[in-house]
Design a protein with these regions (language model features):
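N-terminal amphipathic, basic helical "cap/leader" segment at the start of enzyme domains
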Residues: 1-93, 197-198
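Short proline/glycine-enriched turn/loop segments at secondary-structure junctions
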Residues: 158-165, 182-186
Length: 198
């Protein structure tokens, strides 16, 4: 079994995350940059973008999420929501992944035959970059979980960090030290997902 496949198998969703991180912020930043830069994109569009948050900026993001969800959540359910958000806030950092939409539009104009496909291909590219970053963090000893509070937080995030208008928020990858166990992976039967022909 290749080391790459072992890394894929080892990647899990860790929800109990902390600050006992051995890597420096610079090392983590380099790891994330390398993972995103070396992730393939259709037509070499390189449309994924990443904003890396540590410290106060990381905590600010989850304060924004909590504030955005409060008016949208029934009062009796909000304590559970607060507890969930607190678990993300307690982590070490967050990577926000964005799709750069001008690149997608330009490619649609250049290659009209495939115009309808470019938005889907851009989402695939974002997924690849996100999964590679997640796996790289896990291989470096950090746990992570993936959240999707967009578009509820889009405007507040853009204002707080001066995000360009052509960057569309797609996900939030929360990471930190592994402070608990991950749940067991469950898989559908292979015959539901794969077909092989000769």
């Amino acid at each position: 079994m290749s080391q790459f496949l072992e890394s894929l198998k080892d990647r899990r969703s860790f929800y109990s995350l902390g600050h006992d991180v051995k890597l420096s912020e610079e090392e983590i930043t380099t790891l994330i940059k390398d993972a995103v830069k070396n992730s393939p994109t259709a037509f070499n569009a390189q449309s994924p973008r990443a904003v890396i948050l540590f410290g106060n900026a990381h905590e600010k993001l989850w304060n924004i999420v909590e504030e955005a969800l409060k008016p949208l959540t029934p009062a009796e359910a909000f304590p559970n929501t607060q507890a969930k958000i607190a678990s993300f806030r307690n982590a070490y950092g967050t990577v926000m992944f964005f799709k750069e939409t001008d690149t997608v539009k330009n490619l649609q104009e250049q290659f009209a035959l495939y115009a309808d496909n470019f938005p889907d291909w851009a989402e695939q590219s974002n997924g690849i970059a996100t999964a590679n970053t997640w796996t790289a963090l896990n291989s470096a000893g950090l746990g992570a979980n993936l959240q999707h509070y967009n578009p509820v937080i889009d405007d507040a995030v853009a204002e707080e960090w001066n995000i360009p208008a052509n960057w569309q928020l797609r996900s939030q990858l929360v990471f930190g030290s592994k402070e608990g166990e991950a749940n067991e992976k469950e898989f559908l039967a292979d015959d539901e997902r794969f077909r092989v022909f000769h």
